[in-house]
Amino acid sequence: MDKVIQELKELEVGKVLENEPLSNHTTIKIGGPADVLVIPKDIQAVKDTMKVVKKHGVKWTAIGRGSNLLVLDEGIRGVVIKLGQGLDHMEIDGEQVTVGGGYSVVRLATGISKKGLSGLEFAAGIPGSVGGAVYMNAGAHGSDISKVLVKALILFEDGTIEWLTNEEMAFSYRTSILQNKRPGICLEAVLQLEQKERDQIVAQMQKNKDYRKETQPVSNPCAGSIFRNPLPEHAGRLVEEAGLKGHQIGGAKVSEMHGNFIVNAGGATAKDVLDLIAFIQKTIKEKYDIDMHTEVEIIGEKR
């Protein structure tokens, strides 16, 4: 790994951190160390990093802003690439927006609303990066990324980079082709929006933000929604009806505000969260005969 670190630093790809605690890079403030964490300064730096990784046959993992993510306590071996400030560009051309995978979804939604561009009102208050939103087809309030994405620049597992159209992304509820059939990460996205009355867009976004603040634990460290909604049921409602709000294992606690959120109540480990998830799944299965599948991405070394 020393040679990998040396080459990455020589190429000046951006920040290169050794044995970096990933709890510093996740919204739930949980996660063991990455052998090496690279925060690339631009897309070329991502390409250069991948060349080094492939040359040495080192395992690699990519993360965004750390929302909707649970990193296990043992951390992640190999190189972790964090898409952040180096990939946070945005260009507007009429009703089309090109945006980097590291760009904040909240910042994007707010910025385009001020330009009178509609299509991302649903994203008001959604934490995380554009790359992560594309990866999991993030959504709320009856809409999602698939409704506005034209194409996405994807870095695949084998290190190749290519554009995929909306159709090729094979979007469905909180899912894209990147999660299983063609594992990869989004470096850049092109979105098709619609010019509308600015005041109406801003008002709708504020309404969505207020709803999120009133119903979700935005002030506590959490990873976002833990479970996918087992349609037509809602995960949070099932957890609440089962009397599990406030249930705690170790430092992990089911939010008192919303049943589909687990918060870090202090000193929580990934094991605490996993044990709590398993307890919820078992309880819901026994009470309602419904299987609860996780929406949060769980990555890292298993003991």
Curated annotation (Swiss-Prot):
Limits of the FAD-binding PCMH-type domain: 29-196
This enzyme's EC code(s): 1.3.1.98
GO cellular component: cytosol
Pathway of action: Cell wall biogenesis; peptidoglycan biosynthesis
Active site, UniProt feature: 174, 225 (proton donor), 295
Localization: Cytoplasm
Family affiliation: Belongs to the MurB family.
Statement: the UniProt record of this protein carries the keyword Nucleotide-binding: no
Catalytic activity: UDP-N-acetyl-alpha-D-muramate + NADP(+) = UDP-N-acetyl-3-O-(1-carboxyvinyl)-alpha-D-glucosamine + NADPH + H(+)
Annotated protein name in UniProt: UDP-N-acetylenolpyruvoylglucosamine reductase
Entry keyword annotation includes Acetylation: no
Disulfide links within the chain: none
Keywords associated with the record: Cell cycle, Cell division, Cell shape, Cell wall biogenesis/degradation, Cytoplasm, FAD, Flavoprotein, NADP, Oxidoreductase, Peptidoglycan synthesis
TM helices/strands, residue ranges: none
Cofactors: FAD
Known role: Cell wall formation.
Gene Ontology molecular function: any one: FAD binding
GO biological process: one example: cell division
